[in-house]
Amino acid sequence: MIIADNIKQFHSIRNSLIKQQKIGFVPTMGALHNGHISLIKKAKSENDVVIVSIFVNPTQFNNPNDYQTYPNQLQQDIQILASLDVDVLFNPSEKDIYPDGNLLRIEPKLEIANILEGKSRPGHFSGMLTVVLKLLQITKPNNLYLGEKDYQQVMLIKQLVKDFFINTKIIVCPTQRQPSGLPLSSRNKNLTSTDIEIANKIYEILRQDDFSNLEELTNKINSTGAKLQYIQKLNNRIFLAFYIGKVRLIDNFLKETGPSC
């Protein structure tokens, strides 16, 4: 596996690739888990070259504490990527991605950008779309692999690719879950054993609910010791975000299936 720690190194690697080679790209913020691994394996099966990026993007965090406490396990991540035969790890610094600071940003005007996560985390989608555009311009992949767990993010990136005429196909992969139904997330690494017990109770409640009374469901979730930030039905999906202690988790799933594995 080749590791590029800056854009100049990456461009040299990217330019050396044969034009006919199909390139798959999996953007991450590190702290890799089986959800990321499933994306990488999918990319490996469909491309000649797989690029994974690790960059914790500061502009998509509206809470400084969330940014400061985001899990960092770079050496472990490198071992995971090497074991998966990833071809290139792009691990840029903030200075690489924002050489002149955060001077230009994508400001989404779509309705989906202003509800749920957009409403709860002002500026999040702007920062996310800005860095995704930068990463796509740098990596120039044929295929981009994203997880369904970040559903709003996926919808906005699809619009980004369309509006900026980016010649990249987006492949959306199913959310990977623990046996309890809890979606895999890098932030899960910050959960204590007690927090995990609370999360398991929440997903036991969710698996048994028919989502006909969200107020009653809110009370049930809050009774576990968690703090529900929102739960909402949108089309045929259930979206929710909640805190367990200081850890914020999000999820979405089809109403008919619930949070099934």
Curated annotation (Swiss-Prot):
Superkingdom of source: Bacteria
Subcellular location: Cytoplasm
Biological process per Gene Ontology, one example term: pantothenate biosynthetic process
Coiled-coil residue windows: none
Single Gene Ontology MF annotation: ATP binding
Binding site for beta-alanine: 60
Pathway the protein takes part in: Cofactor biosynthesis; (R)-pantothenate biosynthesis; (R)-pantothenate from (R)-pantoate and beta-alanine: step 1/1
Amino acids binding ATP: 29-36, 147-150, 184-187
Enzyme superclass (EC): ligase
Pfam families documented for this protein: Pantoate_ligase
GO cellular component: cytosol
InterPro entries in UniProt: Cyt_trans-like, Pantoate_ligase, Pantoate_ligase_C, Rossmann-like_a/b/a_fold
Residues the entry annotates as binding (R)-pantoate: 60, 153
Catalytic activity: (R)-pantoate + beta-alanine + ATP = (R)-pantothenate + AMP + diphosphate + H(+)
Function according to Swiss-Prot or TrEMBL: Catalyzes the condensation of pantoate with beta-alanine in an ATP-dependent reaction via a pantoyl-adenylate intermediate.
Self-association state and partner proteins as the record states: Homodimer.
Other comment: The reaction proceeds by a bi uni uni bi ping pong mechanism.
Family per record: Belongs to the pantothenate synthetase family.
Protein name in the entry: Pantothenate synthetase
Gene that produces this protein: panC
